[in-house]
Amino acid sequence: WAYAYLRMLHHKNPTLYFQTLLAEPAFLMPIVYTPTVGEACQKFGTLPFLPRGCYVSLADRGNVKAVLKEYADAMLPKDSLGNPQCQCIVFSDGGRILGLGDLGAWGMGIPIGKLDLYTVCGGFDPNKTMPVIIDAGCTDASGNSAKLTIRDHAMYTGMKQNRVKHTCPQGTEVNTAYYGPDSFIGEFMTAARELFGRSCLLQFEDFNSNDAFPLLEEYRGKFLTYNDDIQGTASVAIAAVLGGIKLQKPGCTNLLGELQGMRVLFHGAGSANIGSAELMIREAGVPATSVLVTNSRGVIWKSADGAQGNFRNDEQKSVAVEGEPQGYDRTDLVSIIKHHQPDILIGAVGRA
């Protein structure tokens, strides 16, 4: 209820709302964003407040620019020429809300909360930000951790249909509408850039990992965009590790050099840990042989030719160790730690 109260306060008096958050950020941000926002998203349509944000559904295909413009004309400030001003768009399809799974259009709490975080901690003008939900449907109760029948709830206002998916060449299921010459994501990204200019940040948020990685690779070179779950979390994780090394060795003048000599175990193989592992290997210079990543099947491994292994997608394959682990239980975390004796353990799993 504290979450709902703060959302109502924002609706009635945005200035007072942000002044309140700025007065007690350490106390209030966990209510506005994680961890409280997860429960709020599970009940989003039933909470007594008027949420802000723009909903763009597959039914808007071909008219996405008009939908964004209608929202922008009504909600965003204008420049001297009457053009709406937007610094940042955080958009999600609700496909993987935190560790809770597919919450569909009820995932709007995440873009709203993330932009509030950027205002309080990053100085973004809240009047020039835009939370967006890409409504591509929602899976049934099997698609979320609490087994909630969100899609069939009387108060659910999103598209009451299952997500249309196909198996991509890499063997994973992806949202069909996001790929190909008529990509819905491509139409959205292009429309946003045409309306708000190339300097408007377009941030992917809480997409399913199977979509998050290929979409980031597709658009990162074409738009001002990034994926917070992959890149943002990875940056913070590596910074935390370097900070830990500095605390442990106050006189160290080469933190990266110290990190490069350590063994690292990533428990969990979602967007956060895969992004962190790749950043550690590619940018921090940690040898790939010193990095282990686990998924639900244990330590991720691949054969020498890459044809076999227990990886689930190309991203997991990229951080897999070569050769099937032997001599210990590769599915048991304690056994893995005893055998490999990592210097650093980073956990990012939906449920431990």
Residue ranges, per PLM feature:
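Metallocofactor- and cofactor-centric catalytic cores in central/energy metabolism, strongly enriched
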Residues: 1-261, 281-283, 287, 311-314, ...
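Glycine-rich Rossmann-fold phosphate-binding loop(s) that bind the pyrophosphate
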Residues: 93, 268-269
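A short, small-residue-rich loop immediately preceding and capping a beta-strand
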Residues: 262-268
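NAD(P)-binding Rossmann-fold cofactor-contacting core
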Residues: 267, 285-318
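Flexible, active-site-proximal loop/turn residues at the rims of small-molecule/cofactor binding pockets
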Residues: 270, 297, 351
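N-terminal Rossmann-fold NAD(P) dinucleotide-binding loop
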Residues: 273-274
